[in-house]
Swiss-Prot record:
Function field: Binds to sialic acid-containing receptors on the cell surface, bringing about the attachment of the virus particle to the cell. This attachment induces virion internalization of about two third of the virus particles through clathrin-dependent endocytosis and about one third through a clathrin- and caveolin-independent pathway. Plays a major role in the determination of host range restriction and virulence. Class I viral fusion protein.
Residues annotated as transmembrane: 534-554
Record site feature (Cleavage), residues: R349, G350
Protein localization: Virion membrane; Host apical cell membrane
Pfam families (alphabetical): Hemagglutinin (PF00509)
Protein name: Hemagglutinin
Keyword annotations: Clathrin- and caveolin-independent endocytosis of virus by host, Clathrin-mediated endocytosis of virus by host, Disulfide bond, Fusion of virus membrane with host endosomal membrane, Fusion of virus membrane with host membrane, Glycoprotein, Hemagglutinin, Host cell membrane, Host membrane, Host-virus interaction, Lipoprotein, Membrane, Palmitate, Signal, Transmembrane, Transmembrane helix, Viral attachment to host cell, Viral envelope protein, Viral penetration into host cytoplasm, Virion, Virus endocytosis by host, Virus entry into host cell
Keyword Transmembrane helix among record annotations: yes
Amino acid sequence: MNTQILILATSAFFYVRADKICLGHHAVSNGTKVDTLTEKGIEVVNATETVEQTNIPKICSKGKQTVDLGQCGLLGTVIGPPQCDQFLEFSANLIVERREGNDICYPGKFDNEETLRKILRKSGGIKKENMGFTYTGVRTNGETSACRRSRSSFYAEMKWLLSSTDNGTFPQMTKSYKNTKKVPALIIWGIHHSGSTTEQTRLYGSGNKLITVWSSKYQQSFVPNPGPRPQMNGQSGRIDFHWLMLDPNDTVTFSFNGAFIAPDRASFLRGKSLGIQSDAQLDNNCEGECYHIGGTIISNLPFQNINSRAIGKCPRYVKQKSLMLATGMKNVPEAPAHKQLTHHMRKKRGLFGAIAGFIENGWEGLIDGWYGYKHQNAQGEGTAADYKSTQSAINQITGKLNRLIEKTNQQFELIDNEFNEIEKQIGNVINWTRDSIIEVWSYNAEFLVAVENQHTIDLTDSEMNKLYEKVRRQLRENAEEDGNGCFEIFHQCDNDCMASIRNNTYDHKKYRKEAIQNRIQIDAVKLSSGYKDIILWFSFGASCFLFLAIAMGLVFICIKNGNMRCTICI
């Protein structure tokens, strides 16, 4: 039998690794989530809190001229009950009212009390001037057991005018005071409502009583209303205190025939101050500019969630407990399976029309900058940060928190001023209006932070895109984008070559000839990734068919020549 030996030759295929440079951005394993205008919970590399929640439970008074009123109520400083004797005149830029403080001794109330309290809180203290009133035919030493010093007395800054004798006639009187100062004068007087008609007659004589007060801007008449009332401090009578701010060179006139509590001294405000109501302890070892009932807020943040009634140089109160401001790029932690040179990429439009960042996975090892390169060549692999693009992004983000504070201050100061004008006309802003303002502030805060976050993410994405385009323009036809943030270079590119790409000094003409030759060789056999599997299977099938055909041909020739016999047994 003739024997033929068939030798099958096999071809060996090998892969030559191409030089490659990839672009990426910094990432961390655990970023911070922020909200933008279009999306909530976006993770960024860096973010800072804009809402202060830390309170110091003390009144920080270092560097302040502080007056602690203790048992004296603020309004008491202008009428002079016994508990306020030491505060009839004072200077301060921080006035602290305590819960135990009381404005009065003989029971009564102030007209437009909160507005007067607000004026006094801002007063900077009080100084007094005698109004020069003298009286004949009446007693000026009315006193009460409700206002005790060593014995029965009265308000230090007021005169309780009585008939010269019990049940005696009270004469009609007119008294005037001209403000000769260059600042407004605070004038306070009282109307006495006796506990009964009998008491009123005993104190001021019989007949109807009428008190009239006028100036160039004010005119009002008062009629006392005697009658029984619940006893307070042992008294069933009441004193209603009224007041006005008398302009310079203006004159106030009082006309009365009884039941009149006359002012003795006019009050003048010394300057400016902050007045707070708090039982927190004074602390002269810390400084503060923002105060509330629970203590001091010390913060450089634009917003706070501690107290809506804080006063001074304060962050604006918002309902949100946290509003994170992005100060870094969008973070996509590097997955273990993707800690290679290649990275998935995506492109989309940002809110403001710029191309948003397209590199999906960051590099956690890129710690020297926000953007950078990785490369591989015959000399190995390397990583380098791009400082120019990093600094460009940082420069645009630096000061973002301060700019946010400026925006909120400008916006909210306008709102404050508008409502201050309303308060002068109609009194205090009612609570529902205050709540509405807080709603507006809270919405504005959330909106402004979301806008800034959107801008930051678009900005940092744009810097990534600029860096990518810079590399693409340098390499031109000497490399090909692989769609994964990398460029496959068609020539040998050593470390100096890679450095020239990073430094924007790459000379594509120098490598053009080599790159074109290698591109032609690669393109001749390059398969599109979409059809690679199909062609490989087709090639395998065709090879098997060809091998089978050759084998059958050899068998047929051998049978024909008698070198092989086929016997079929049934």
